[in-house]
């Protein structure tokens, strides 16, 4: 439609119908950070306009304003400005601010991808972490099985990338993943992913409020007889069988700092080595954090978006 012309309602309905046929994909903020201060409303007023200043102070969201300052400050090293080919976003998880930036350095002309834990407490690095090697790490075996319910036209939250059958997943209406690694794994099997929780956890930005137009039910794919509560109804597709190998046992009793990728692993580990509760522990910001923080005080539990970040900050 040309600007200023009267809208043909018949053509508009046809356009809307065709537009809705497109698959909607919301890209992850960890890979595609937004422009600095994106979404914040700026307003100019005179220095002596006290009335306007008082009104703005009443409605201003101070936490968001502070995040905007951090994002703009990050761009200052290149002179700032909207013309920079750099995205930067600050997110807050359990009182820990994380800055994610990606783009092209105007000085070196090279592309970069950076993640910084801004409010990170200084941590003394150690020589022995758990797990020390993800390739050799094993606390459970997963026995893949058929889906416990039909997936046709359902909205799904995928937490793992391995499945006994892929075709049933292609019949789903909408697919979200718990993180970007799961997204990449299932995408290799020909699945179109519509969005991801980005490793921030199920409660950070609920799927039905942020990632879907229709507030219809979402089902979480998980393991059978999962006794831990989820905000989503579940569909099982594998069994979790305790099976800890020799490398992991040795690593478990040698480690000084621990990163937990699931509460199940944490629960099994403290049965084998109870003094882990007095050691340094860390995990992601989602359900694992929520469950472990009921056992270990939150102030003693570090939060990292993934294992690689934990390794970067805690391994000497």
Language model features: what each stretch is:
Residues 104-316:
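Signature of uroporphyrinogen-III synthase
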Residues 1-125:
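Small-molecule-sensing regulatory modules
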